């Protein structure tokens, strides 16, 4: 049977997982914090247990337009279930109970972005699709810079010669310094509104125990900023921004080098950078990240349709009215 847990109990269970699964963005406290970006999102923490084994799914529930249906989807970044057992039979039993919970709870459909570093598709029995490749820098037992390409090392050198310095700031600066700098950078890029966040979001992030803020500056001018999460073994790059002058001085190159150096000192195994803005192999963002490492991890998405008839009827209705986004599983969002 699936149980809905409170945040404290869910986080306590999460802390019992193997270190490789305890990534910050899969934690219940992150999922709860992320829900502050949209008042329509409700964080839910669902658990299946058998003796000493558990399956835990921290996700967001939202209403489907003006219908009586709800959907489930990952927090910003990644999501999907995690479990203390790798037994496929246990996962199958958990999934059967989860499907029943979805049906009885009025869930129409679910969409998840599975974490490349967790490999948690093994705990998800819905439809799984490959999306794109992502990049991570190895840290354990090696100098991180050994994985850098010549062009990346050259950029780091240019930043250092230009007088750029990288420094860690107190978490409170995630709400004090980061938002305005980030917003200006996103406006300059004409970024999708999906990547814009209210003040409450940064307030919530600043209170997470695993969060750290890196600032690169030259003199008094901020050139780059990045939010990173420290998990049990893996650092995750979450959000960042660079000004025009920062790009000219290669400040973001120095930012990732400094984060990797700190991770190595802390005994972390990986610095996860993510992938490109889409699945294109020639993505400029992927090209930048690929300069830091040749280690690749596949990003996969997962979904399930709980009520196919209702799903298809709504889809047809929105297609007829020109309101359906057919590139999305949750075509109404």
Where does each model-flagged region fall?
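Short, high-confidence coil segments that cap the C-terminus of an alpha-helix
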Residues: 41-43, 104-107, 211, 265-268
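A short, internal acetyl-CoA/4′-phosphopantetheine-binding micro-motif in the GNAT/acyltransferase core
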Residues: 77-89, 140-142, 240-249, 277
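Aromatic (often tryptophan-rich) hydrophobic motifs at membrane interfaces
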Residues: 96-99, 201-313
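Short catalytic-loop micro-motif centered on adjacent basic/acidic residues
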Residues: 111, 167, 271-274
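Non-catalytic accessory segments adjacent to catalytic cores
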Residues: 89-131
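A conserved beta-strand-loop-helix scaffold within acyl/acetyltransferase catalytic domains
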Residues: 1-66, 114-248
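Conserved acyl-donor/pantetheine-binding loop and adjacent beta-alpha core of acyl/acetyltransferases
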Residues: 61-78
């Amino acid at each position: 049977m699936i149980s809905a847990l409170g945040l404290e109990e869910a986080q306590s269970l999460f802390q019992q997982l193997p270190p490789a699964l305890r990534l910050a963005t899969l934690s219940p406290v992150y999922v709860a914090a992320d829900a502050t970006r949209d008042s329509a999102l409700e964080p839910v923490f669902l658990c299946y247990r058998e003796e000493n084994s558990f399956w835990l799914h921290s996700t967001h529930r939202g209403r489907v337009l003006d219908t009586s249906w709800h959907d489930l989807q990952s927090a910003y970044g990644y999501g999907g279930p995690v479990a203390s057992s790798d037994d496929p039979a246990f996962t199958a039993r958990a999934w059967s109970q989860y499907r029943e919970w979805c049906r009885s709870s009025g869930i129409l459909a679910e969409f998840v972005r599975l974490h490349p570093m967790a490999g948690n598709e093994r705990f998800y029995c819905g439809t799984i699709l490959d999306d794109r490749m992502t990049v991570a820098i190895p840290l354990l037992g090696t100098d991180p810079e050994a994985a850098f390409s010549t062009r990346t090392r050259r950029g780091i050198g240019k930043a250092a010669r230009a007088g750029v310095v990288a420094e860690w700031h107190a978490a409170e600066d995630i709400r004090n310094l980061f938002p305005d700098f980030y917003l200006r950078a996103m406006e300059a890029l004409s970024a999708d509104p999906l990547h814009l966040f209210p003040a409450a979001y940064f307030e919530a992030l600043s209170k997470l125990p695993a969060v750290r803020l890196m600032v690169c500056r030259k003199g008094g001018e901020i050139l780059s900023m990045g939010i990173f999460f420290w998990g049990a073994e893996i650092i995750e790059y979450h959000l960042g921004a660079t000004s025009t002058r920062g790009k000219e001085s290669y400040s973001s190159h120095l930012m990732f080098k400094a984060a990797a150096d700190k991770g190595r000192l802390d005994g972390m195994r990986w610095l996860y950078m993510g992938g490109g803005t889409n699945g294109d192999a020639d993505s400029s963002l992927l090209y930048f990240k690929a300069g830091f490492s040749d280690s690749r991890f596949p990003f996969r998405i997962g979904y399930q349709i709980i009520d196919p008839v209702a799903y298809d009827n709504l889809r047809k209705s929105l297609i007829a009215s020109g309101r359906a986004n057919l590139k999305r599983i949750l075509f109404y969002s």
